[in-house]
Every structure is written in C-alpha cells, then in structure tokens.
Amino acid sequence: MKVRDIIAVIEDFAPLSIQEGWDNSGLCVGSPEAEVSSVLFALDCTESLVDEAIECGADMIITHHPLIFSGLKKISPEDQVGAAVIKAIKNGISIYAAHTNADKVVAGVSGAMAAKLGLVDVQILDEDGEGTGLGVVGNLPQPLAVESVMSLVKDRFSLKVLKSSKPLDGMITRVAMCGGSGGSLIGAARKSGAQLYISGDISYHNFFTPEGFMIMDIGHYESEIEIVNILFSLIRKNFPTFAVRITQNINSNPIYYF
C-alpha cells in the first residue's frame, strides 16, 4: 500500500479541489509514493501525536487540521510545528490533512453534526458548487421548545456548558449548523429560514441576534471531532484488512473549562 492509495480514497470522498483558497489541505509531509502499513487518525497533529505514531508503528498520520497552515520561514525543533515536522521526517511518517474539503461535503464535518442532532432533509447551507459548500441546514423531526433543544445539543455533543444568544420564544423546527469557526455563515443561516444556528468560535457581537433567531456556540473542537471517526471508517471500509487506529489521546482540545 502506498500513501497515494490512501489519499485517493479520501479525495474521492472530499476532493482537494474544493478546499478554500486559504487552506492547506493535502499531503504536507512525505511522498505519495511512500509505502504505508498503518495509519493513525486525529483531529490535530502535534509532536505528541507523532510520538504516538512512532510508538504504535504508524507510518502515516491523517488529521482534519493541517499541521502547516502557511509558509514556514524556518523549521526548528524549538517551534511546535517544526518539531513535529522534523520528527515525522526522521521516522518516515507521512502527514495528510483533510480540512475544508471535508467541511464542504454534505457527509463531512457539518453533516456529521446534523446527524448527531437527528436533523432530516439536510442540505448544504452556503453552496458554492454542485452539492458542495460550507455548513448544512435541516429540520428537526418534530418541533421542539428551546429548552429541549438545549438539552439535546448538550447531550449529543457531550457538553458541560453551552454558550447561547438570548433564547427565542416559540418552537424550533429548522436548524443550520457549521463545524469549526462559523461566524461568516450567520447571514446564510438566517436566510435559510433556520430559527437556530449552531457553530463554534462565534464572536461577542454576533450574539446580538434579531427576534426569532438564535445562536449556540458549542466550541470549535466539539463541533468537528466526529470527522476523525468519519475518516477512520472511510479507510477501514475501503481497506478492511489494513491497520488503522484512532489516537488514544483523542481529546486534543486546547481549551479548558473550569
């Protein structure tokens, strides 16, 4: 098995061509012609994840967030990214990221959020191509009061706390969602007819919502973590006898709640 064989499956699911222009999805360390015998999956690539790959014998890492977002001026072991790159190269470990390309397919990050919440009739929220785009919007199976939706969201996403705008009056029937940093899609969520928009990294001023519309911020990590299972299952399904594993340190969230 070669790295390019693994990449082909991922990019059939989420083509690299649909990633956002600022993004750096794809193979950032290694060669597509390198041999691979085992893959380790995680949300974020850190030096400790590379250490785990070495310990478990994985020669490829697949994450959602790219290790390298922009051009590096230097590669140094004193830098977090540089240390991970150096260690990966020394140990023959390839690193691949499926970021906004995995955000922009309906079965990707935001679609996984919708599935967790049980939405039906799900479609792309901000379509920029044939069936691709950021965010999703769908309907609850039945109208729910705000308090019930809050409880459902906290349960399905394993949240101890939930950040929300002022609760609206009336029932919620339609919900828009976007994994990661979704502040830019608030306008699209309102236009979609959703009474509720769920995302992460929402800024302070966006919580001043108009009548009949509300926002819930569940956190960047919490909204995206399911993509790890999606990518893992994708490779396992296509290569059932291949060695794949999800990081044992699954919680790479750098944000702590006290």
For the regions a protein language model found, what residue spans apply to each?
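Active-site catalytic microenvironments in core metabolic enzymes, especially phosphate/sugar-handling
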Residues: 1-258
